[in-house]
Amino acid sequence: MERSDSRDFYNFAKTSSDNNSALFDASQYEFFGQSLEEVELGGLDDDGTVRGHVDDEEYHLFDKREGAGLGSLSDMDDLATTFAKLNRNVTGPKHLGVIGDRGSGSFSRESSTATDWTQDNEFTSWLDQHTVEEQVQEASWSSQPQSSPNSNSLYRTSSYPQQQTQLQHYSSEPIIVPESTFTSFPSPGKRSQQSSPSHIHRAPSLPGGSQSNFSAPNASPLSNSTFHLSGLSHGPSHYGNNLARYASCGPTLGNMVQQPPHWVTDPGLLHGDHSALLHSLMQQQHLQQLPPRNGFTSQQLISLQQRQSLAHLAALQSQLYSSYPSPSHKALFGVGEVREHKHKSSHRSRKNRGGISQQTSDLASQKSESGLQFRSKYMTSEEIESILKMQHSNSHSSDPYVNDYYHQARLAKKSSGSRTKPQLYPSHLKDHQSRSRNSSDQQPQVHVDALGKITLPSICRPRALLEVDSPPSSGHKHLEDEPLVAARVTIEDAFGVLIDIVDIDRTLQFNRPQDGGAQLRRKRQILLEGLATSLQLVDPFSKTGQKTGLTTKDDIVFLRITTLPKGRKLLTKYLQLLVPGTEIARVVCMAVFRHLRFLFGGLPSDSLAAETIANLAKAVTVCVQAMDLRALSACLAAVVCSSEQPPLRPIGSSSGDGASVVLVSLLERAAEVIVAVVPPRVSNHGNPNDGLWRASFDEFFSLLTKYCRSKYETIHGQNHDNAADVLELAIKREMPAELLRASLRHTNEDQRNFLLNVGRSASPVSESTTTRASASGGQINSEFVRG
């Protein structure tokens, strides 16, 4: 600012103060001296034209030397008390036309004044700043003369709503203060342009969004500049003479920057607590009673320092508060109320200021300590949040055993031979609900999880996939009555049970519980028994004593499941998970031996289906190898009592050899058990299990000899005219030689003679061989049996 401009400015201020030396009369304002509940603050509901600025004649600059005409201290105290009450009303409980309680988290929507107060989204920070402004400017307002008795607008009060639109800018918007053109004290020619509140350039107290580095070049101008209270309180340029005295006696901004614990590291200041700042500002207010030593020099000094201090102060405070959103500001509103004004405020910010920092402020305001909050018409935010948590827990599991099972299983299989084998087991096991014991209950207990998946408590009663009410005369069946559909549903549910059993086994292997796994083993046994019950298998040798004859419909569920290739896979997996030698293993194996022709009667052309049948035969063989003589006798009796003739083919037959494989394993296991259990030269009639075995084997041997005789007659009739070598090859290809060899250890003398006669009729046997066989006491080696 030029020296001539400063002199004109000083003369104008002196003349204005001489002509307007009247005392400030607060009683002419309608809201002074009245009850605050009955005050209707002017301007909030006024739809008229808003004044752009105040004429120069309303508020005149005055010199500090005219302080003698300020009036008594009691008037100042009354005015301060009135403004203090007004401030408490603003920040206190909710009244008509006044912003509601801070602790309530919202304000009254019914009040028209409250609606006007919410013109922008950033007014939350204005409440805290407004408290600082009112207390800082009490002395300045009390010392200003009133020029016009008709003036009813006071720009520094909290009741003027249009000033709010300007004060809202510094909540989250960076305020860019140009250093080259900014002047706190305009020249007389430009005074009218900056007298209006809409043209005032302020240094905000709580800005956000701007970034600045505290480097030496940036902080150096601050150390030489004076910290003016008018910069913080956003005072208009009319109070220029007051700024002059602040420049002479106020604390410097450089000193405050040199104290990082107060400006930077103070958590209360960064989080909306302005008590420390307010205390320091009030102390500075009492130190401003001394007049400036040289007003002319002060005016010139203020012009230079104000440009530097306010520019750097804006950048400094923008950095301090841009990355530290105050929780108290968030608590003023719920997230739902903020979202109501988000669209309008964002649109207005993008139109006026670019909208970059506004979007950042909106995102920051939506982040609260309790997480996201939702608004709905029929549900509360807690209910919506609980549903989202349930869905997230079901669809976003942190267990790699569930999310990345195939990769983890591949790693475990790849490193099976290494020392550091990865532990493949679930972090928690599935909790199965207990099934209702009431047999008369026809409705299954259905559990629906968060994702809508329906878990059946029992697979023996699958839930209907489609409910359709058909006419009684219609011959169509319900979908649940279709046999294969019900079988597929049962297979899928049974595989789910088997997966749970595998999880229990892996948990027992890698993570043994404190009780040694007794509870998990009990749970595993219950699941296996429930699956056997679901298959509806019949046990003629059950301990209940019900030894009734078998019917064709006894194993109907078992047959329907094993009709499908996936059902055979289920049976194979189930046999592999059974504990060998248990009653469940015996019951399942008896069902397999009753239906040897159904399971192993033909070899399918599909390689995968053929492999499934071969795996089923191997699984049955493993279970048989752990059976005792009683279980072996029951399985062999199941073969004899079956209504179907077993396919007694030689092992390696192209038509399928599964039945012969399991029968050979049964006969060999029985020979081992008999030798270990029954002492030699002891009568077999004393052991009931041995008697059952003898009866079962006699029936089986009779069945085997009949099959061999019929097969021999068929082969001999087809190859009667052929040579002996061709006949011998045909007999070898069709006769079950492995079954005959496995049966030799269980035959008596009559049965051995029969086998000898079959061998003689099958091919010529040398007389010397027959003589040696007779001399050996009737013991016939397997080499003697041809074919």
From Swiss-Prot:
Skewed-composition ranges (Polar residues): 105-120, 154-171, 180-198, 208-221, 355-373, 436-445
The keyword Lipoprotein is assigned to this record: no
Residues found modified as Phosphoserine: 184, 192
Key words, A-Z: mRNA processing, Phosphoprotein
InterPro entries associated with the record: Pat1-like
Domain of life where this protein originates: Eukaryota
An example Gene Ontology CC term for this record: Lsm1-7-Pat1 complex
Keyword NAD tagged: no
Compositionally biased tracts (Low complexity): 142-153
GO MF, one annotated term: mRNA binding
A biological process term (GO) from this entry: mRNA processing
Compositional bias per record (Basic residues), positions renumbered to this chain: 341-353
Region (Disordered): 94-120, 134-221, 338-374, 411-445, 765-787
Function: Activator of mRNA decapping. Involved in mRNA decay via decapping.
Protein's recorded name: Protein PAT1 homolog 2
Gene assigned in the entry: PAT1H2
